[in-house]
Structures are given as C-alpha cells and as structure tokens.
Amino acid sequence: MLRLYQPCLPTRALKAPTGANWIHEIKHDGFRIIARRINGRVRLQTKQGYDYAERYPEIVEAISRLKVSSIVLDGEAMCFTGPAHDFDKLWNRTHDHEAKLCAFDLLELDGEDYRPKPLAERKKKLFKLLRRVWRGIEYVEHLEGDGAVIFEHACKLGLEGIVCTRFTLPSRPVEDLDQSQKPSAPCHAARQRSV
C-alpha cells in the first residue's frame, strides 16, 4: 500500500532555540519536494501535490541510481548558478542550469517507514546513502551548537535563514507543531519545523 507523505512545514519563531537537542541547517529557497522512488518510478511531489519529475530530470536520474529498492526523501529542489542558487532559474526551468535535490530527511527506505525514528537516526542513514557525490542530489549538512549564534552568522551571510529541529523527534505532520523550531534569516523572524 502506498503511504501518503506530507512535508513537515516550518513555522516562524522570534529567535533561534538553544540547547543540546537542536540541530541547525541552512534554509534553502527552492521548491519543497517529497521525492519518492517506488516500483522503479520516481515522483517529485510538491507541497500542492504536483509531480515535477518531468521538470527536474537530473533529480529523477540521481534518485534512480540510488542502490535501494524504494526510498522517500524530503528536501528542496534547487538551481545553483555558481556558489549561490537562483530561484528564478528554478521556476522558469529552461534546463540550461542544473537542478539538484538538497535532501534533509529520510522518510522511507526499502519499504520501512522511517518517520517514527528520531531525526538523528534518519539523518545518519541519509548521510550514508548520499555521502558519495551524486549529480542531481546532495545531503543537507547540519550544525550543532548555539542556535542564536548560528542564526546571527546566517544573517551576516545574507542567507535565506536557518532551520532548527530537535534531533530526538520523529517526523510528524504539521498539525502536531509544538516542539521544533526554524529560524529564518536575512534577519527574518525565526521559524520552526516539526520533525
């Protein structure tokens, strides 16, 4: 039976969380994608439920090459032009700039639902799957430490923001928000994501 997956969406907070149980990731400004490969078919589902597989063939190819029987990833489709990414090129998608999936969570692997597992376990497994350099897909690194300091640095660098998540939580739908945080820079208010 095909499981349904909804992304754990971030919510705004006024400041970054602190404490040992939090991890912090760069907030990317791309298309949120639930990427799945089931029975050999790859789908790239947007938040609105559209399949963008035809729009991003390089992401489809990368997911097809993974040495797994089935997989579901949560991430952002990005279009990089040099060291930064370009949302307009991603949206207009003329295929003259390569897109990639920046994967930050593993939701299912080889038929096993990973959502009940703690984020620490999911990210560790995801890192092992994606530690090779893959064209079209990459693992989103995280930082541990003082969220306020990381958020301040993100603002200074002009980044879109940071996402802060409790390392011990399972992945949960957006209705369950209460224990996770996502600070968003260019000095926007902080945001939180339930995971």
Predicted regions and their residues:
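Catalytic cores of nucleic-acid ligases and guanylyltransferases
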Residues: 1-195
